[in-house]
């Protein structure tokens, strides 16, 4: 039986749900607007110059976006934060003269914790990391969608391309990036109670840190995998093979997930209410090596994996649900 939302839900909870619904509607609304812009002749006078500018002249998505404080500090994101709720724990001090790569785990279905903590100022990251400007990175393909690209850049978000990463890390003291290391593949392992990440073969971010002399910071979000359920898709199953094939062809993973609705608790595309605790570890200083060997990359990869495991073990009992399993690294 479907459980509907009662009529006497407090106003603040309705506002929290509204904030999450607005977040969920950004992509479809932008797609509808882009479609209308292109197919309706009335709008071509706007569409042609906008698309030319977007594809041939505007490269801000490769250099840190166009951060708008009004957007990042909006009260909307405070309600968004409180819906789950989402909290941020920072375990160290960071040198504002250095550049950092914050490596975020796990991906979850849509990296809610990464967005709230690194793209908005809902948990006061700007005050907790004084002197640092952290840019959350996302797929290059997201910046090919009219209007969506402008929304993303207003949060200071940028492309996850190599060029974008290096542009930001070399643009001045304190300029830093947040990478969701597991990517699309990891989203297929996101389900409640599991802490399964894709990391063993992910070494590009280690090389990026070495080439640019940026310090690495492990970040783990307890609860990121608990806000959506997902159709069973064990490795080797037909469902997983189809998902992997689509991911290989498009770069986008299609997890078959289910959350809740605006007016019910049992089905829909909104995430369920479940606390997310994002823990930021201590920085790992990395030497600047323009042409690191595979052995050097492997060495620092092992150091990073150990640091992430220690971070998880240290905070698991205090930040995660009792039924949460151990960290599994694929």
Swiss-Prot record:
It catalyses: an acyl-CoA + a 1,2-diacyl-sn-glycerol = a triacyl-sn-glycerol + CoA; all-trans-retinol + an acyl-CoA = an all-trans-retinyl ester + CoA; 2-(9Z-octadecenoyl)-glycerol + (9Z)-octadecenoyl-CoA = 1,2-di-(9Z-octadecenoyl)-sn-glycerol + CoA; 1,2-di-(9Z-octadecenoyl)-sn-glycerol + (9Z)-octadecenoyl-CoA = 1,2,3-tri-(9Z-octadecenoyl)-glycerol + CoA. One of its GO terms (cellular component) is perinuclear endoplasmic reticulum membrane. Pathway: Glycerolipid metabolism; triacylglycerol biosynthesis. The chain crosses the membrane at residues 15-35, 37-57. It holds the Pfam family DAGAT. One of its GO terms (molecular function) is diacylglycerol O-acyltransferase activity. It is an enzyme of class 2 (transferase). It is found in: Endoplasmic reticulum membrane. GO terms for biological process: diacylglycerol biosynthetic process; glycerol metabolic process; monoacylglycerol biosynthetic process; triglyceride biosynthetic process. Its main location: endoplasmic reticulum. Its EC number is 2.3.1.20, 2.3.1.76. Keywords: Acyltransferase, Endoplasmic reticulum, Glycerol metabolism, Lipid biosynthesis, Lipid metabolism, Membrane, Transferase, Transmembrane, Transmembrane helix. It is a multi-pass membrane protein. It comes from the Eukaryota. Catalyzes the terminal and only committed step in triacylglycerol synthesis by using diacylglycerol and fatty acyl CoA as substrates. Required for storage lipid synthesis. Belongs to the diacylglycerol acyltransferase family. This is Diacylglycerol O-acyltransferase 2. It comes from Dictyostelium discoideum. The gene is dgat2.
């Amino acid at each position: 039986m479907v459980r509907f939302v009662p009529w006497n839900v407090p106003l603040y909870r309705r506002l929290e749900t509204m904030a999450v619904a607005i977040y969920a509607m950004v992509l479809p609304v932008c797609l509808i607007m882009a479609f209308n812009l292109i197919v309706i002749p009335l709008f071509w006078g706007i569409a042609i110059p906008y698309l030319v500018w977007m594809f041939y002249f505007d490269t801000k998505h490769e250099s840190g976006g166009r951060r708008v404080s009004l957007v990042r500090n909006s009260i909307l994101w405070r309600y968004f934060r409180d819906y789950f709720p989402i909290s941020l724990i920072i375990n160290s001090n960071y040198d504002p003269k250095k550049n950092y790569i914050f490596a975020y785990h796990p991906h979850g279905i849509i990296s809610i914790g990464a967005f709230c903590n690194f793209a908005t100022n809902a948990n006061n990251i700007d005050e907790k990391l004084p002197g640092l400007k952290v840019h959350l990175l996302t797929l290059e393909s997201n910046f090919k969608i009219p209007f969506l690209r402008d929304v993303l850049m207003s949060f200071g978000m940028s492309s996850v391309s190599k060029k974008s990463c290096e542009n930001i890390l070399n643009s001045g003291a304190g300029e830093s990036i947040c990478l969701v290391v597991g990517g699309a593949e990891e989203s297929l392992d996101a389900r409640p109670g599991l802490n399964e990440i894709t990391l063993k073969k992910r070494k590009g971010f280690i090389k990026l840190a070495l080439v640019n002399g940026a310090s690495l910071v492990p970040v783990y979000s307890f609860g990121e995998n608990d806000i959506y359920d997902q159709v069973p898709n064990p490795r080797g199953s037909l469902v997983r093979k189809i998902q992997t094939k689509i991911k290989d062809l498009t770069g986008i993973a299609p997890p078959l997930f289910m959350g809740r609705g605006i007016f019910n608790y049992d089905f829909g595309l909104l995430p369920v209410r479940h606390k997310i605790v994002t823990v930021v570890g201590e920085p790992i200083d990395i030497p600047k090596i323009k042409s690191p060997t595979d052995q050097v990359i492997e060495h620092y990869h092992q150091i990073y994996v150990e640091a992430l495991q220690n971070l998880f073990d240290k905070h698991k009992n205090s930040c995660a649900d009792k039924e949460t399993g151990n960290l599994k690294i694929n």
